[in-house]
Curated annotation (Swiss-Prot):
Name this protein carries in UniProt: Enolase
Lineage, opening ranks: Bacteria, Pseudomonadati, Pseudomonadota, Gammaproteobacteria, Lysobacterales
Gene that specifies this protein: eno
Gene Ontology cellular-component annotations: cell surface; extracellular region; phosphopyruvate hydratase complex
The UniProt record lists the keyword Glycoprotein: no
Cofactor binding notes: Binds a second Mg(2+) ion via substrate during catalysis.
Primary enzyme class: lyase
Gene Ontology molecular functions: magnesium ion binding; phosphopyruvate hydratase activity
Subunit structure: Component of the RNA degradosome, a multiprotein complex involved in RNA processing and mRNA degradation.
E.C. no: 4.2.1.11
Entry's localization field: Cytoplasm; Secreted; Cell surface
Amino acid sequence: MTTIAKILAREILDSRGNPTLEAEVTLDDGSFGRAAVPSGASTGTKEAVELRDGDKTRYLGKGVRHAVDNVNGTIAETLKNFDAADQQGLDRRLIDLDGTENKGRLGANALLGVSLAAAHAVAASRKQPLWQYLSTITESDVALPVPMMNIINGGAHADNNVDFQEFMVLPVGCSSFSEALRAGTEIFHSLKSVLKGHGLSTAVGDEGGFAPDFRSNVEALDTILEAIGKAGYTAGEDILLGLDVASSEFYDNGKYNLVGENKRLTSEQFVDFLADWVAQYPIISIEDGLAEDDWAGWKLLTERVGKKVQLVGDDLFVTNPKIFKQGIDSGTANAILIKVNQIGTLTETLEAIAMAHAAHYASIVSHRSGETEDTTIADIAVATTATQIKTGSLCRSDRVAKYNQLLRIEQALGSGARYAGRDAFVSLKR
């Protein structure tokens, strides 16, 4: 039986040393599922609410005891004897129980922990790996996603003068996920050598990428190209580049303030700036190229480079199907970043991915800068029509855990394992 016998939550630590919530669901047959909730550093203003205690005398106000109490009290009582195999019904019950648009009463962290743990428990009850169980919900063909490997950190993820938050390599020319992971790892180590040779720091940021104090943003791109060549790969063929501009972080009074470039640009000027980069470098993906409230700028960027480059809405869409529909209807961007904690339940996460697929938008399953050893997002990426995954660099166990899970899944699939590769960019095929 997949009816819920017990729900239990606790406060644990994430990769930045901040508290987060972990939930466990036990079923009547003794099957058990556990999930930990991630947390972001740069967050969209329309994200579901992560409930924090606010008590400055404890964990500097970042404790999650209230969210834990909500799980162990109201949620556990309401869902006792509920059939966890009814994922949609369970998530609807959680949403109704919270009763707010942004999940601010019980906390999106409380709802998400239970939602994901329930899926783990049902998979265990059916003696299936999570990705296989989820694929029965999504009715999707399974595939190994292209990893978007964040090897240089800037912005809110590092203490340096780099404005852009992430510089990524995408090994699209590899024949398998395991080969793609090897390529990324070799480039990562090559980059460390290049940075040392330039007398730059090899300290890493929140997501495991290096965080050197470059003189400008473009210097980061040039250094990555050098590292790709040194590792024996060809940029533009084997390896493409991706950016997370996270432009909401430096958007102020209608201008984009680039400290690294000593420039203050209008939306039109910043679109020109990004378009010039696309013309000069093998860039295939730009995330949050414009600020989340600059819809006119987004429209302009989409018209300018949207047929050549994947334009990913993160802060723009916050994994919210209602907001995402506005983007689809207006032809804004051509891809969506999927973060489970931005929306707060598994069902809504899967709904956003399905919406993207129907609209020929690409979807990228993503971690957060505050992560744990939880690997759920790896299984979600395989079991859905998402063709890419963002889960950080090639160091820090909270990032590598997801890559290792994907290696396990690839091995389990055997000859049936398919790597998305160049086919990952579905929005550029229309």
